[in-house]
UniProtKB/Swiss-Prot annotation:
Its main location: mitochondrion. It comes from Rhipicephalus sanguineus (Brown dog tick). GO terms for biological process: mitochondrial electron transport, cytochrome c to oxygen. GO terms for molecular function: cytochrome-c oxidase activity. PANTHER family: CYTOCHROME C OXIDASE SUBUNIT 3, CYTOCHROME C OXIDASE SUBUNIT III. It comes from the Eukaryota. The lineage of its organism: Eukaryota, Metazoa, Ecdysozoa, Arthropoda, Chelicerata. This is Cytochrome c oxidase subunit 3.
Length: 257
């Protein structure tokens, strides 16, 4: 019997398997950049997918069936999510810092101009503008879903959340199509490396956010979320809005400016 409101978690293999998978993914990308095989990347993605699914399943069981997510536990989860998003903010700040450091005072090695001489950037009013419209629309639909849950309109919540997920998938597809059309590579100096690193990392966040929303979708569908206990969905919505805001900065400074 517990005499405190906190949840002391059981031993779980998923943190260590997720860590090993993340390390394998990083090593896989290094190998790929050295023109080696992509097998390690594919294996790492599979391991991350399995670990994430199992970890989410365990958390859902603890909160929905075992009743471990008390008011105090939820406060801790909220603080953890806020700190996680804050760490992600500083991660993107480092990329923008590198971009502005090079673009505001371009040196003679890149022709004393920005974009560097020989680099042909994307037209911001084609796919980038379309993707901006898609992400802004997805921010509206996820907010719609949020309010529908609070009003116990779960059918509307499911429909609007499904639209959000489809918009996220559409964004990822258009981003990939844009990369295939690019007239420069990640190895083309500071412009190519900062552009593809920042937009690619953002694209990864969109993919993760879409999976996060998909988990929330199935939890709502299986009646594991109620109008007074829905932090799992709320966390995914916070993450999605963060992705939206980062894209607005990306579009403004890396495409348009």
């Amino acid at each position: 019997m517990m005499f405190h409101p906190f949840h002391l978690v059981e031993k779980s293999p998923w943190p260590i398997t997720s860590s090993i998978s993340a390390l394998s993914l990083t090593l896989g990308f290094v190998s790929y950049f050295q023109n080696l095989s992509m097998y390690l990347i594919l294996l790492a993605v599979l391991m991350i997918t399995i670990s994430s699914f199992q970890w989410w399943r365990d958390i859902s069981r603890e909160g929905s069936f075992q009743g471990f997510h008390t008011h105090w536990v939820l406060n801790g989860l909220k603080m953890g999510m806020i700190l996680f998003i804050l760490s992600e903010v500083f991660f993107f700040v480092s990329f923008f810092w590198a971009f502005f450091h090079s673009s505001l005072s371009p040196n003679i090695e890149i022709g004393s101009q920005w974009p560097p001489k020989g680099i042909y950037p994307f037209n911001p009013f084609e796919i980038p503008l379309l993707n901006s419209t898609i992400l802004i629309s997805s921010g509206i639909t996820v907010t719609w879903s949020h309010h529908a849950i609070m009003n116990k309109n779960y059918i509307s919540a499911l429909n609007s959340l499904l639209i959000t997920i489809l918009l996220g998938v559409a964004f990822t597809m258009f981003q990939g199509f844009e990369y295939f059309q690019a007239q420069f590579k990640i190895s083309d100096g500071i412009f190519g490396s900062t552009f593809f690193m920042t937009t690619g990392f953002h694209g990864l966040h969109v993919l993760i956010g879409s999976i996060f929303l998909l988990v929330s979708y199935f939890r709502i569908k299986n009646q594991l979320i109620s109008s007074d206990h829905f932090f799992g969905f709320e966390a995914s919505a916070w993450y999605w809005h963060f992705v939206d805001v980062v894209w607005l900065f990306l579009f403004t400074f890396m495409y348009w400016w």
